[in-house]
Amino acid sequence: MAEANPRRGKMRFRRNAASFPGNLHLVLVLRPTSFLQRTFTDIGFWFSQEDFMLKLPVVMLSSVSDLLTYIDDKQLTPELGGTLQYCHSEWIIFRNAIENFALTVKEMAQMLQSFGTELAETELPDDIPSIEEILAIRAERYHLLKNDITAVTKEGKILLTNLEVPDTEGAVSSRLECHRQISGDWQTINKLLTQVHDMETAFDGFWEKHQLKMEQYLQLWKFEQDFQQLVTEVEFLLNQQAELADVTGTIAQVKQKIKKLENLDENSQELLSKAQFVILHGHKLAANHHYALDLICQRCNELRYLSDILVNEIKAKRIQLSRTFKMHKLLQQARQCCDEGECLLANQEIDKFQSKEDAQKALQDIENFLEMALPFINYEPETLQYEFDVILSPELKVQMKTIQLKLENIRSIFENQQAGFRNLADKHVRPIQFVVPTPENLVTSGTPFFSSKQGKKTWRQNQSNLKIEVVPDCQEKRSSGPSSSLDNGNSLDVLKNHVLNELIQTERVYVRELYTVLLGYRAEMDNPEMFDLMPPLLRNKKDILFGNMAEIYEFHNDIFLSSLENCAHAPERVGPCFLERKDDFQMYAKYCQNKPRSETIWRKYSECAFFQECQRKLKHRLRLDSYLLKPVQRITKYQLLLKELLKYSKDCEGSALLKKALDAMLDLLKSVNDSMHQIAINGYIGNLNELGKMIMQGGFSVWIGHKKGATKMKDLARFKPMQRHLFLYEKAIVFCKRRVESGEGSDRYPSYSFKHCWKMDEVGITEYVKGDNRKFEIWYGEKEEVYIVQASNVDVKMTWLKEIRNILLKQQELLTVKKRKQQDQLTERDKFQISLQQNDEKQQGAFISTEETELEHTSTVVEVCEAIASVQAEANTVWTEASQSAEISEEPAEWSSNYFYPTYDENEEENRPLMRPVSEMALLY
């Protein structure tokens, strides 16, 4: 190392020591050749010797030749006295080329990685032209990248070639010397070329797989497009076929439908050929190991299934129309047969039957007619019913019965004539007389053969002459009385069957609508593909939005619908069908109770894209909220249909059970309605279910009446009635205030703020209040609290009073039974002592009552005491008679479970005597 300036040499030395990869063992210092520089170097090195004093020796060399003592000349360049051929500028050029090539390889790797990521993560479009365009663009980019890889490979090979030393005779020794220098660079370039080759191989493999997948994706979309088009066309033909479902009508209309069906069959053949081609194409894709193998097989099966349905439906429709045409043809031929028979009867004149030859000719004509009409006459109605039951409409059945009766009557007439003509041919004594059936036979015939604008003709035999008598229309009407009643009965059966059919058909539609809602909306809320269209807060609201609709669907689809279908030909089974499953209908109460919460969710999220997309897929004209209302509408529809069915089933088999079913459904509706009101009660501390069954509920106008004890000034100043909603339970009566929010988006269901609750064992009533016959009193305890209640009408008032009386009666009966058990446990002595004590109390109570009340109330008190004494025998009778006497006298009547008061006037309320509790008075009897 040569350096004129020692300090700079020292700095360079330190840098080399820090960056040298190995350990330093010896430092050689070459001094400058000029005198001054050598002198300065020696002085500077002397003063800075301590800086160079390291843990290794430092040798100061005087000349270049001294280097050969320490270093081989093959390791030194010519300027240092060595033989090593080295060009620093050439080394810099090669070094820059190597570094640039390495950077190019790195950038190429990044480009390939970026392109692969783009191919893997880019979402493909949903239309075929866009897919083809993307496939072309990616193929072009692939070829550009391939060209870049080829250019980089070529550059690396050129650089690798330049690093190799030419193999000449004069340069053999120098090549060996340079081999060690260029071997490291050559290995670097070779390693980079290997890396480029591996990247190219991996990229080609990736592109081959991606191109195959893209081609298969394009094939799948073309297959799916053909599939959807065929499905649409098949469904269109199925809809056209369904329009031919009504096989009734005239024979001309049936012919027209058969012609339309033939045209439809021709169109279907071409469509089925296309479907077969698409199915074969799908099988070919599956055989080529398509990545969507399961989907393609599923589509092929669906297309094959739809094709089979189309073929079977057309085949079944052809058979049905052919049978209908055959039926119409039979009816037409039977009518012609009847017409020919009528003409034959009408053309047989009396004077032609006076000889044997004429009689034989007439007999032959009759035999020919009967032989021709024999197939129609011998056609049994049961056979017709069995053969054409599916296509027989009520009109066709009526026509068939009419023609059948005509044929039977014609046969009867001709058989009688045959017998007469045969007798005439055997006897040659007296002239032939025309033989006709007796009037009794004509009366029993169901349908007359000859009709006239003025009346109908019947045949009679008067002595030896034959006459035609025209029966007036009035006589015909009188004679048709029994048949009209029969027609009335038949019409009731038709109406009953119509209602039953409506019940079954609407049940099928209802089940199908529930299925579409559960599948098209509820199930889609769990579909990850729809999460982007759904607000995050809506995803966990499925059970609130749909309630227990799935439970309702399973009940109707698995159980109730099949039970109703079994009643299609047996209307008497409808009642038991509802009664056996009335407990299952309680699930509707749960659904209705959840309905307010469901509507709140719907109002909040009704405009989100999820519901709109589901509605679009289902092709529903109505939004989801209309279908969420279907269970509520259905449970109210049952009682209407049962009413109609009961209306047409009077005095029929199963009408009693049908009435019970109707009552059960009405009770269910009332229970559901009551439960809806109960869940709207706010502020009640406790469990409302502990109050027993809700009997009634309704709104009333309420005034605070006079109370015993202190009265607040605000109660005295209240003239305007309070609006209260009363809930009557088995064990209590609850007072609430009805609240209805107003404004857009508010809940349309009312809520009830709890005010107070009275236990029924402390409640009493006064049935009549002067001033308005709609008012009555409800009071608590010893009239500590009194409310005057006004109903909307008298009927509502009487209904409430009746239910309250029933509750009080039941409590009185329970109390009586309890007292009786206690009395049975007492001894005779105890009974005697209690009896004496109670008699004393009774006399004392009567004395006090006499002093505090007027004489006009005494009789009422005695009647009440007597009623209490006999309550164990006939409790209901006592209460009923007391109620009736109160209604007749139009005086206030009071009822309580613990205390009884005599009749009173409003001005004498404070002076009313207080009677003993029932628990004490019941022991007097």
Swiss-Prot record:
Any single GO BP term: negative regulation of axonogenesis
Keyword flag Transmembrane: no
Residue ranges of every copy of the CRAL-TRIO domain listed in the record: 1-88
Annotated DH domain residues: 495-675
Span of domain PH: 687-809
A single cellular component GO annotation: cytoskeleton
Compartmental location: Cytoplasm
Alphabetical keyword list: Cytoplasm, Guanine-nucleotide releasing factor, Membrane, Phosphoprotein, Proto-oncogene
PTM info: Phosphorylation by TNK2 enhances guanine nucleotide exchange factor (GEF) activity toward Rho family proteins.
Gene Ontology molecular function, alphabetical: guanyl-nucleotide exchange factor activity
Start and stop residues of the Spectrin repeats: 221-322
Reported tissue expression: Isoform 1 is expressed only in brain. Isoform 3 is expressed in heart, kidney, spleen, liver and testis. Isoform 4 is expressed in brain, heart, kidney, testis, placenta, stomach and peripheral blood. The protein is detectable in brain, heart, kidney, intestine, muscle, lung and testis.
Domain of life: Eukaryota
Function description: Guanine nucleotide exchange factor (GEF) that modulates the Rho family of GTPases. Promotes the conversion of some member of the Rho family GTPase from the GDP-bound to the GTP-bound form. Isoform 1 exhibits no activity toward RHOA, RAC1 or CDC42. Isoform 2 exhibits decreased GEF activity toward CDC42. Isoform 3 exhibits a weak but significant activity toward RAC1 and CDC42. Isoform 4 exhibits significant activity toward RHOA and CDC42. The truncated DBL oncogene is active toward RHOA, RAC1 and CDC42.
Cited PANTHER family: PROTO-ONCOGENE DBL, RHO GUANINE EXCHANGE FACTOR-RELATED
Subunit structure: Interacts with an array of inositol phospholipids such as phosphatidylinositol 3-phosphate (PI3P), phosphatidylinositol 4-phosphate (PI4P) and phosphatidylinositol 5-phosphate (PI5P). May interact with CCPG1.
Domain statement: The CRAL-TRIO domain is involved in interaction with inositol phospholipids.
Family designation: Belongs to the MCF2 family.
Disease per UniProt entry: MCF2 and DBL represent two activated versions of the same proto-oncogene.
Name of the featured protein: Proto-oncogene DBL
Natural source organism: Homo sapiens
Gene symbol of the encoding locus: MCF2
